[in-house]
């Protein structure tokens, strides 16, 4: 079957933003205008099409990023052919940053939504950082221009100040708050208005109001200057006072946006149906198609030092990245993939190159909001959900078995909070195991383990809301009732001293014995190394090289159990430099045990210390309650980093240990008569004070 839309007309984009910037409403409008959804869904009444999980509709926040396929010919049908959008709606709540990270990994471009009133909020900074990390070209859409206190140019200034990027507006707002009427298009130098009759479907173009002409000229000049910097030829033309044509300006802005040099900005009000069609036009005009970005890099599964790449081309070998796993009540597991190269037909066999396992693709579906269309094939650039995958986890590569490749792996953050869950009845016990297993497969930032001493099931995640929602899903989707314990902080441990330790494991008991012997030099790891930094300095074969991986494994396993209070040990450098072996009795197991024994001795010799997670906390409060809020943060061992004035009140930024933040939502509400709000996310690990370390060690026994 031939390709229906050429790959140059694909746009794989994400709509990302802070929790209340109006992202889901914007996605809804995208669906409405692209003709896929004929009745607009409103988040307010819990009917939004992309928010398909019950909890999302109740809480009015988006948890799972639904991938939706839609088509667009332009707000004024100005494109000769239809463009195909794959839109990923991502959550903006801090506890779900993992979802945003997974989506950004597979996108070619992003629309970052800001609220016209609140501007840059804490989560916007996180999302911006993640987009920088993956080099995602983006557009800024300042939404909610109809809200009290909305100001487009002020938000542009905040982005410059707090995110370190100077956006280039290609529109200006006409009016604001209740008087917001539309936009000035700085490319065509026309005013654009919207009709309620067609729900803001087709822009109405008129001359620019006289009182805004001077401002429009100034910002058009700013835009033209940004375009002229694309190359020397345009720069010379501009400096010599020649007019650049609109075609030249557009091409130059597109080139610079895709290169990540500039970020273009537009404005509107999704809720009031003023401006989303122009956002869609801007996506086509300025964000990349899969063929406009560099080929994706990967490695050879058999030899990680060999770098491979795949271009967005149907003729190349098939390769795709699984970026999301979802459980569907009707068809079982859906594996969402982004296809980077080649073609895959339903029924084809592929290999999961990370695990080295073969998989057969049963059926394939494409999502249109929450309807789904069964398709027979996917090609380079497509995003689709595969049904029938047996053992695929987020971040793994599916590819052609003859030409295997491992696409770049994703790094997932370690959880910072844990709670014990106990099934209410015997019947719930079995179901709980299955439910937790499925949820952990869907979400790599969620971990499940059994406490060996108490036999309790411990679940860990990225925040209280994260765990609340998973327990809620367990109840609804799997009918498992459970009791939840008090939240526990996930501490870490590290050593502070350098030391050399001998690990020796010798056992003689009739027949074949065990013999493993190694000397390891332990030290804190180099800057930026979170896990184990393992170095082999054994010379002269005193420890045969086939036993070296077993030594590494022994150290890693003991690190998981810690050496101070039973928490994982991080940032450890271990250099194996000497040892001995026995021709008959030595084996991998013996060396693993020897290394584990050596690591255990760090408790006495390594100057171990306990680390506690520190959260970046941002509280927005009316000025009247500022003193109380700050005093309370100080009592919680918080460090105030600074504050600033915003339309919504004073913003206090602080770093506070997670252990002091449980129940903060209730406390901050009662302190401010319900008027303050806060957000927090994990920032770093710091040495825990002695009294905390002592309490924790006692508790761990």
Curated annotation (Swiss-Prot):
Extent of the signal sequence: none
Main location as per UniProt: cytoplasm
Keyword Ion transport: no
Any one GO cellular component localisation term in the record: cytoplasm
Keyword Metal-binding recorded: no
GO biological process annotation, one example: ribosome disassembly
Binding locations of GTP: 17-24, 89-93, 143-146
InterPro entries cross-referenced by the UniProt entry: EFG_II, EFG_III, EFG_III/V, EFG_IV, EFG_V, EFG_V-like, EFTu-like_2, G_TR_CS
A molecular function GO annotation: GTP binding
Keywords: Cytoplasm, Elongation factor, GTP-binding, Nucleotide-binding, Protein biosynthesis
Boundaries of every tr-type G domain copy: 8-291
Family to which the UniProt record says this protein belongs: Belongs to the TRAFAC class translation factor GTPase superfamily. Classic translation factor GTPase family. EF-G/EF-2 subfamily.
Alphabetized PANTHER family for the sequence: RIBOSOME-RELEASING FACTOR 2, MITOCHONDRIAL (PTHR43261:SF1), TRANSLATION ELONGATION FACTOR G-RELATED (PTHR43261)
HAMAP family in the cross-refs: EF_G_EF_2_B (MF_00054_B)
Protein function: Catalyzes the GTP-dependent ribosomal translocation step during translation elongation. During this step, the ribosome changes from the pre-translocational (PRE) to the post-translocational (POST) state as the newly formed A-site-bound peptidyl-tRNA and P-site-bound deacylated tRNA move to the P and E sites, respectively. Catalyzes the coordinated movement of the two tRNA molecules, the mRNA and conformational changes in the ribosome.
Protein name, entry field: Elongation factor G
Species name: Pseudomonas fluorescens (strain SBW25)
Lineage per the UniProt record: Bacteria, Pseudomonadati, Pseudomonadota, Gammaproteobacteria, Pseudomonadales
């Amino acid at each position: 079957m031939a390709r229906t839309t050429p790959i140059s007309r694909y746009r794989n984009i994400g709509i990302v933003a802070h929790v209340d910037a109006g992202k889901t409403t914007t996605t809804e409008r995208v669906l409405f205008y692209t003709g896929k959804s004929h009745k607009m869904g409103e988040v307010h009444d819990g009917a939004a099409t992309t928010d398909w999980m019950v909890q999302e509709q109740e809480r009015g926040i988006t948890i799972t990023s639904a991938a939706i396929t839609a088509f667009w010919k332009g707000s004024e049908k100005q494109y000769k052919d239809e463009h195909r959008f794959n839109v990923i709606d991502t959550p903006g709540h801090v506890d779900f940053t993992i979802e945003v990270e997974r989506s950004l990994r597979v996108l070619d471009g992003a629309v970052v939504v800001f609220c016209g009133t609140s501007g840059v909020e804490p989560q916007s900074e996180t999302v911006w950082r993640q987009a920088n990390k993956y080099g995602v070209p983006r557009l800024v859409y300042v939404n909610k221009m109809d809200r009290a206190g909305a100001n487009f140019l002020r938000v542009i200034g905040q982005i410059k100040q707090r995110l370190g990027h100077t956006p280039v507006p290609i529109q200006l707002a006409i009016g604001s708050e209740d008087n917001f009427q539309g936009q000035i298009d700085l490319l065509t130098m026309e005013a654009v208005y919207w009709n309620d009759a067609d729900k803001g479907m087709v822009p109405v173009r008129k001359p620019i109001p006289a009182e805004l002409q001077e401002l429009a000229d100034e910002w058009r000049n700013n835009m033209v200057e940004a375009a002229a910097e694309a190359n020397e030829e345009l720069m010379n033309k501009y400096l010599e006072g020649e007019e650049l044509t609109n075609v030249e300006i557009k091409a130059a802005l597109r080139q610079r946006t895709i290169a990540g040099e500039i970020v273009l900005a537009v404005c509107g009000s999704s809720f009031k149906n003023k401006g989303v069609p122009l956002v869609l036009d801007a996506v086509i005009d300025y964000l990349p198609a899969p063929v406009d970005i560099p080929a994706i890099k990967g490695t050879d599964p058999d030899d990680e030092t060999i770098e491979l790449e795949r271009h967005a081309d149907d003729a190349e070998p098939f390769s795709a990245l699984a970026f999301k796993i979802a459980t569907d009540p009707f068809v079982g597991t859906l594996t969402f993939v982004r296809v980077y190269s080649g073609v895959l037909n339903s029924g084809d066999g592929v290999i999961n190159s990370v695990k080295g396992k073969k998989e057969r693709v049963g059926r394939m579906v494409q999502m249109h909001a929450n309807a789904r269309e069964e398709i027979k094939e996917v090609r380079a650039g497509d995003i689709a959900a595969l049904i029938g995958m047996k053992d695929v986890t987020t971040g793994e590569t599916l590819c052609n078995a003859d030409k295997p490749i491992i696409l770049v792996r994703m790094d997932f953050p370690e959880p910072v909070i844990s709670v014990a869950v106990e099934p209410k009845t015997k019947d719930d016990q079995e179901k709980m195991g299955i439910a937790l297993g499925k949820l952990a497969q869907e979400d790599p930032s969620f971990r499940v383990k059994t406490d060996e001493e108490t036999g309790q099931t411990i679940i860990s995640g990225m925040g209280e809301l994260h765990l609340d929602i998973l327990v809620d899903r367990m109840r609804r989707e799997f009918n498992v009732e459970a009791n939840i314990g008090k939240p526990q902080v996930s501490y870490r441990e590290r050593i502070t001293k350098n030391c050399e330790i001998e690990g020796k494991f010798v056992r003689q008991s009739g027949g074949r014995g065990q013999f493993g012997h190694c000397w390891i030099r332990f030290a804190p790891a180099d800057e930026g190394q979170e896990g184990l930094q393992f170095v082999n300095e054994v010379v002269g074969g005193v420890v045969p090289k086939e036993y070296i991986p077993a030594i590494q494994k022994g150290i890693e396993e003991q690190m998981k159990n810690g050496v101070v209070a039973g928490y994982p040990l991080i940032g450890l450098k271990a250099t194996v430099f000497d040892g001995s072996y026995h021709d008959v009795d030595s084996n991998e197991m013996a060396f693993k045990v020897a290394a584990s024994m050596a690591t255990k001795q760090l408790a006495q010799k390594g100057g171990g210390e306990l680390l506690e997670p520190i959260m970046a906390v941002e509280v927005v409060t009316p000025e009247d309650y500022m003193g109380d809020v700050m005093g309370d943060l100080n009592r919680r061992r918080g460090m105030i980093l600074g504050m600033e004035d915003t339309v919504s009140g004073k913003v206090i930024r602080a770093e506070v240990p997670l252990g002091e933040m449980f129940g903060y939502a209730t406390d901050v509400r009662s302190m401010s008569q319900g008027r303050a709000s806060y957000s927090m996310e994990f920032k770093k690990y710091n040495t825990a004070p002695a009294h905390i370390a002592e309490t924790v060690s006692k508790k761990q026994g």
